[in-house]
């Protein structure tokens, strides 16, 4: 979990669904990477869609396109070969990042999402 800087009593949340992960923590980053590798090597998935992906790229308050999260995935011999799809926003300040994700990433955008949703609903 992630606490508000300088306030150990309140959670920091840019997801709108509860609490944000402290992705800059080495232990959290390792847990994410181990989980992703497991799904690729053991369950044979070929890619991932990251909901509220901007949250994963927040180093402190801003979204960092050079964050450790992106860097370690790009350097990983297994994960760098998977399909990576970002929902490129969250509810935090500066969280709308359509067109701002690094190479190897595809971006899910709201217009596409709404079109697909309307199609399936009829």
Locate each region found by the language model:
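Substrate-binding/active-site clefts of carbohydrate-active enzymes
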Residues: 1-45, 49-75, 94-95
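Conserved alpha/beta catalytic core and glycan-binding cleft of carbohydrate-active enzymes
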Residues: 44-46, 59-60, 65-122
């Amino acid at each position: 979990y992630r606490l508000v800087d300088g306030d150990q009593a309140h959670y920091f949340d840019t997801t709108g669904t509860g609490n944000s992960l402290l992705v800059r923590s080495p232990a959290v980053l390792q847990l994410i990477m181990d989980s992703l590798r497991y799904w690729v090597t053991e369950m044979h998935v070929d890619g991932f869609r990251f909901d509220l992906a901007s949250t994963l790229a927040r180093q402190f308050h801003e979204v960092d396109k050079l964050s450790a999260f992106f860097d370690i995935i790009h350097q990983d011999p297994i994960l760098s070969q998977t399909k990576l799809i970002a929902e490129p926003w969250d509810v935090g300040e500066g969280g709308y990042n359509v067109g701002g994700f690094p190479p190897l990433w595809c971006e899910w955008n709201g217009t596409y999402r709404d079109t697909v949703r309307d199609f399936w609903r009829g």
